[in-house]
Amino acid sequence: MIRLYTAKTPNGYKATIALEELALQYSVHHVDISKAERPEDFLAASPNNKIPAIVDESNPADPISIFESGAILVYLAEKTGKLLPPSGRARAETMAWTFWQVGNTGPMLGQLGFFAMRAPEKIPFAIQRYVDESARLLKVMDQRLDANEYLGGADYSIADIMNYTWIAAAQGYLKEQLGAYFQDKPSLNRWLEVVGARPAVKKGLTIPE
């Protein structure tokens, strides 16, 4: 059994989608990220005090705690032998696009969301800076998907899960800032539709309730 600490965020949904795709048994522990105080068992699993985090209790004598969404998805994929090619070019490209998300779409879209929607003061320069960079990243993805069915190549993988949750969220919540940049991205929109139609993705986006 895997213990999952999560919340309703793009990073949290990465873990629930992966767990659903891999048909792993897990229990959900909803972390209220609006509160400063967090449960001690969560902090033990996530020293950075961020969701998601998991504790793999398959071996009760030696449970394994993992934090950071990219590390979690790689661990789960390697544990099951699914969603991550074992070697060669396919693995290298899947890993590259997995961690491209960690360093690019997550931080840029997250900052755009903060400055456009939550910052107490609107700073036009900051908003435009993150709009421009986010638009560039959408173009990078569209170009990749022009030549490949999925981000890692021919097969659906953790790279798609990692990126999908953020791109789908941006398409919905940042429509005012980025809507126009989705309109001329046929391959990106095709990928969004295909990934979004997967049963595990649909279910993962409902957890926690």
What is the meaning of each model-derived region?
Residues A44, A197, T206-I207:
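Phosphate-coordinating loops and pocket residues in cytosolic domains that bind phosphorylated ligands
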Residues L76, T98-A197:
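GST-like fold's C-terminal all-alpha helical module
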Residues M1-R3, E193, E209:
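Basic/polar N-terminal segments that are highly enriched at the extreme N-terminus
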Residues V194, V201-G204:
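Charged phosphate-binding loop/patch that engages nucleotide di/tri-phosphates or the phosphate backbone
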Residues G110-Q111, T206-P208:
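Short coil/turn segments at secondary-structure boundaries
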Residues M1-Q128:
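GST-like domain detector, emphasizing the conserved glutathione-binding G-site
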